[in-house]
Amino acid sequence: MKLTFLGTGAAIPTKYRAHPSISLKFDGEIFLFDCGENTQRQIIFTDVSPMKINNIFISHLHGDHILGIPGLMQSIAFQGRTKPLNIYGPKETAKMIENILNVGYHSIDYPINVYEISAKSPEKIISSDNYEVFSFPVVHSVPALAYVFKQVKKPRMDLEKVNKLGIEIGPDLKRLKDGFNIELNGKIITPDDVTVPPKKGICVGYSGDTIPLNEFAEFLKELKCTTLIHEATFDKSMDKNAKETLHSTVSDALNIAKLSGVNTVILTHISARYDEISAYEKDIVEFKAEHPDLHILIAEDLMEYSLKGK
């Protein structure tokens, strides 16, 4: 699994930071979290394939998180896309996409599926054989969502147990792999009899724009998340601004990371007021003095971060 930070800025882009967008590459697919203006151009400088983007997850409908969608949709249409594009977001996402398609002379020949998500309670919005995606309602000035991407690992077959029970390669073994019981020599054998617990999978949380929420930290902990991407629009000295605009500071994000039990936190959504990040680094040094085990990164445009399960 690999994260690519296409844009790490906030409401106003800078020379160094584009509007928010994060690519998550897993098992040959690209999952895009937010799609700010200029996202498709940022992609050019990476190994992210636009044609492999099957799912876009929108945290909320502020312009800095969605204005890259029209251009991206048009470009992949020009490249001959035929498979569906799934777009997830809060209430009014469908209206937003409809408005995009009704403005200008778009030629979109592939299906676009829009899924509006309740901002009232956590939901499992995708469930597949090897991953799950969850939404979590957060608090911002408009309906907003956080997301969690969780790798699903299945129990592994223990060949020593298989051989000891005299199970041969064939239909019986396949049924056990598929999760069904079998009968052998008058004895019922269950999948648990021939497997070992799965290794811990990768789990990544993305806060979107939000105030710090202990409930979100608890949700991440429940899902055993290993990495958190959290907005940090302001440094600690601007706590008042963060509260007024319903954003988070560096310290807020780090405290949520600590409460959630993740190993790594990556700070993003950096305000345009910061030409350099010394104020962020100061807050991080203070936090690390008491919590040295937490791995802390400040995201930069085009930064890549690889994740491996245990």
UniProtKB/Swiss-Prot annotation:
Q: Which pairs of Cys residues are joined through disulfide bonds in the record?
A: none
Binding-site residues for Zn(2+) 2, renumbered to this chain? 64-65, 209, 269
This chain is encoded by the gene named rnz
The entry describes its oligomerization and partners as:
Homodimer.
Entry's InterPro entries?
RibonucZ/Hydroxyglut_hydro, RNase_Z/BN, tRNase_Z_dom
Q: What's the source species for this entry? A: Methanococcus maripaludis (strain C7 / ATCC BAA-1331)
Give the EC number(s) listed in the UniProt record: 3.1.26.11
Against HAMAP family, the record matches this protein to: RNase_Z_BN
Provide the top EC class. Answer: hydrolase
Which residues act catalytically here?
64 (proton acceptor)
Any one GO molecular function term: 3'-tRNA processing endoribonuclease activity
Q: What's the protein name?
A: Ribonuclease Z
Sites binding Zn(2+) 1 sit at 60, 62, 140, 209
